[in-house]
Amino acid sequence: MTSIQERGTSAHLHSLKEGEASDRSSEMLPKQRSIIGSHVQRPPSQTTLGRSRAGSNTMNKVSGLDIARRPSENLLSNMNCSDNGNGGNMLNSFVNSALPPPKVNPAQTRRERPASNSSIGTKTTEVFSSTSASSSLGDTSDEGEGSDADKSKINTFPSILMEKATQGRGANGNGMRSASNNTIVEATTDGSKMALQKSMSFDDTAAEKTMNKSRHSYQEQFSSKKSQSSLLNSKQRSRAKSQTCSSTGYNNSSILKTFGISSKISNSSDRIEASSLEFNVPSQKPLNCKPLTPSQKYRLRKEQSEMNLRNTIKRKEKFYDSQEQILELQEGDVDDSLIWNVPMASLSTNSFLASAKPDDMNNLAGKNDLSEYTGGLVNDNSEISYTKQNHRYSNISFASTTSNASLLDFNEMPTSPIPGLNKVTDFQFIQDTTKSLASVYLHSSNRLSRSKLSERTKSSDFLPIELKEAQNQGMEDLILVSENKLDVVSHSRPSWLPPKDRQEKKLHERQINKSMSVASLDQLGKNKDREEKLIRDETNRQKYVLLLDRDITRNSSLQSLSKMVWDTPFSDETRSTIYSEILQSKTRFITKNYIQPFHELQELLTKMGDFPKNKEIEISQLIETSLRRKVSGLHDICPDLMLLLKIKSISSQGIVTGDELLFHHFLVSESFQNLGLNEIWNIVNLVQMTCFNDLCKEKFDAKVLERKGVVAGYLSQNEEFKDEFNTECINSTTWWNILERIDHKLFMWIMDIIVVNNSQSYKNSPINEDEFVNKDWEYYRSKKVVINYKILISFALNVLLNYHFGFTDLRSLCNVNDQRFCIPVFINDEFVDADTVNAVFIKKWAHYYKKF
């Protein structure tokens, strides 16, 4: 019965094939062969028939469209080679009539790759669906590229077989009615119908079971052991490929079973599961050696990262759950099994050990990274990324372990006995080893802590002043200042303000360095000027001596003297002599003729007995207001000042403005201390009569407020002086308020300048004593005294323009309560040179004096 059925079916299909060959177009047969067996190696008897039915032009057209062959083609080729001629004719006729080829757009010359969203779009989270598995399965054939339409054709293979089988059944029925009543052929046709229907139903059931099993195996594999698929060797991979080819054609195997050739194909469920397992396992490199698309790689990495995260969370939860009973232990209720003989470091050294980063360990880690990179270049992309990731973590752990080990000196450990050979118990061996390890750790940590503390002690010298003050107050220990804190603190910002960021710190450091460079250059210039000034002062002092020897009253000497006095004050040895000679010549004519002798007035004061109380109070109040409350009160006041003022009060001139200042500074000056009160009396009266006489005061008051004068030219330009540009604020009396605020050293220099600018050349025009016999002082003053009010006005102008702060006007200057207020500003700083400040004041004064 079986042989009759086979022969009948073969004959029926052969006749069906001949009948449809004339009705169908020439393109149908190549399309059908492209799905199942367009390139099947047929026996010689079938080759001629296939060529005559299909035509070479149609086959060339299909081959030029780059339509990939299916895995069933190779399978059917093997079966056709082993089958007889009748079986081959029957199979070829069924293939040519049952399966239509895919429709191809004739205008499309190149198969374009589909868009990423359409090629991998899915609603599930699976990396590869059954469709993608089947498509990758089809790509393992001889062709390299296949279209998505061909892959969908393979997946819908059972429905195509059902349709073509129904069409074939109808065609067979028509052929049998036109051929006469042949009972054998009808029986054969009915048998083929039943067999084909059974095969279709079996194929549908088998396909559904296979898909369910593949999904189930995929889920079980990812939930239990993810690394199962990566451990397949090359033999298992090749075996999985062969099983995949057979399992992909499971629909074909059920059809061929109908024709009695099912023994050629193995359609077991175990092999189907193996193939589905192989292709559902996500891996960076597919088995067909084709690279994945970027979207598939992304989904693969996403799935792997999610699985790693889930596994990590499970391990963490499991670890902490197992430790819950340890956390619940109360203090003092500790299990004995939890106590170990482990050496522990103190908190101070533990921080050092944790933060230590040796340079050799960094170099070692860098070399490992380089070797790892160069060694991994021979692998593919997936292996490089996986290897570099693993090596990175291994290098970090190795470097940290080696860095910690390098801090420990294991050479201190004694040689340990060998267990089993020496008579040492295990307990004794473990105890000795732990003691040795503890000693090594403690010694190494102590050595490291000492080195760290020594480094911090050295670096504490460069910390900001605020931190040093905090240490002095017990608020912070500079030895415990770490390197991280040193990075955020800076000398240019107080410690209570937020730290600077790196860019701001660099910018400020650059600006500070620039400012320091400029300041250093300025300081170098100042040092050079100071050295030059010292040399110049010493030279000028020697010149003063030479001028005195040569006659200082000469015209040339006075010119040189007037220039040098602006740079260098008189020395203590030459001051008194220069004053006397340039004001009254060597003959001392004024002292002899117009100044009352000191000893006569002193005798008169003695004869008076009790000095008038009101006069004495006035003198005391004058000393108090003019000296003690001013900058002169910072120094001791000579007791002889009271005597000199009393004598001056009973003299013919009486006490005039400025007497208390002149007597005080001359008494304090070393230039007149050794000369006695008589000489001081004569010098003070000489200066008052020549430099500050009544005529000079009158001219000062008249010229200082002159509208076209120099003072008015400066002060009228500024509206701030409009309230003090009057006779009440600027006059000869308020001029002395300025001198009350002048320091002693600068005061003597000012007197030197005023005296020199009131001198005259007695060498060229000597004093004729006979001319001034029985002449009063006014006559002599009109003939031989220089009235230089300009030097006094320029002095006041210098103060008003450059040092007018701390007081409203010259009249209110005497009422300033600050004793330390000084002109120039009193600076009590050891780094500030008072001589330099005074020299600047004198230079400005000389500048304004040249304007007159």
From Swiss-Prot:
Biased composition (Low complexity): 124-139, 224-235
UniProt keyword terms in alphabetical order: Cell wall biogenesis/degradation, Cytoplasm, Golgi apparatus, Phosphoprotein, Protein transport, Transport
TM helices/strands, residue ranges: none
One biological process term in Gene Ontology: protein transport
Polar residues biased stretches: 43-61, 74-96
Keyword match Protein transport: yes
PTM-bearing positions, type Phosphoserine: S72, S201, S459, S517, S520
Annotated stretches, region: Disordered: 1-158, 206-248
Cellular component GO terms held in the UniProt record: Golgi apparatus
Keyword Cell wall biogenesis/degradation: yes
Compositional bias ranges of the Basic and acidic residues kind: 15-26
Protein task: With SBE2, is involved in cell wall integrity and polarity processes like bud growth, through the transport of CHS3 and UTR2 to sites of growth.
Name of protein: Protein SBE22
The organism's taxonomic lineage, starting at the top: Eukaryota, Fungi, Dikarya, Ascomycota, Saccharomycotina
Gene: SBE22
